[in-house]
UniProtKB/Swiss-Prot annotation:
Annotated keywords: Capsid protein, T=1 icosahedral capsid protein, Virion
Protein name: Capsid protein
Residue ranges of the region described as Disordered: 1-32
Compositional bias per record (Basic residues), positions renumbered to this chain: 1-13
Subcellular location: Virion
């Protein structure tokens, strides 16, 4: 009996130790390897409806313009380092937001960030300078983007942690800004810092 009780206790202990604790949102975490993972939750209302000129003529895009959103946590990190290598940067719509009707069928894409010295043909060399940045949009005519390059519709820029972006969410016919409503987004950034300031 005593052995059975001890093994039961051990089993409970192991189960409890396997509990995963999630970090709260809106936090920048820094590892010892010189990489930063940043996540922030924001919300936005759609500003206008744009026809999608492409394979499906009845498809429409909803424009979410949240340019000028500030990230104080990222700003403090950038003030301590001269540059970052951008591993990934973009936004995901939060699924099943009760305020965002049809969120489960909305797709979100994001454009990359480039340093002024980099070229669009070298996507592996992305640098955010702490004193400014430059956006290299894949398509200047955002109102009618080609269907063959759907993952390059947005502009994202960072200048002292002010990151603005233009987000398109594609959906089927009958879509309207009123139907979509107020949507939540998860903005994410995986950065590798370099050039620590003295």
């Amino acid at each position: 009996m005593a052995n059975r009780r001890q093994s039961r206790r051990r089993g409970n202990k192991n189960r409890n130790s396997a509990t995963v604790r999630r970090a709260p949102p809106n936090r920048a975490t820094q590892s010892s390897s010189g990489k930063v993972k940043f996540v922030k939750w924001i919300a936005a209302s759609p500003t206008k409806l744009i026809p999608h000129i492409g394979e499906n003529e009845t498809s429409y895009g909803v424009l979410f313009d949240i340019t000028g959103t500030t990230f104080p946590e990222l700003s403090s990190l950038m003030s301590r380092h001269s540059r970052y290598r951008v591993l990934s940067l973009g936004a995901r719509i939060v699924p099943y937001d009760p305020n965002c009707l049809g969120a489960h069928s909305v797709k979100v894409f994001a454009e990359s960030v480039y340093d002024s010295s980099a070229t669009p043909t070298v996507p592996s060399v992305h640098y955010l300078q702490s004193n400014g940045c430059r956006v290299v949009p894949a398509n200047k005519q955002l109102s009618s983007p080609p269907s063959s390059d759907v993952n390059k519709y947005y502009e994202i820029c960072s200048d002292d942690a002010v990151i603005g972006r233009i987000m398109y969410a594609w959906n089927g016919p009958g879509l309207s800004t009123a139907r979509v409503g107020f949507c939540s987004f998860e903005v994410y950034a995986d950065l590798e810092f370099d050039g620590i300031r003295e």
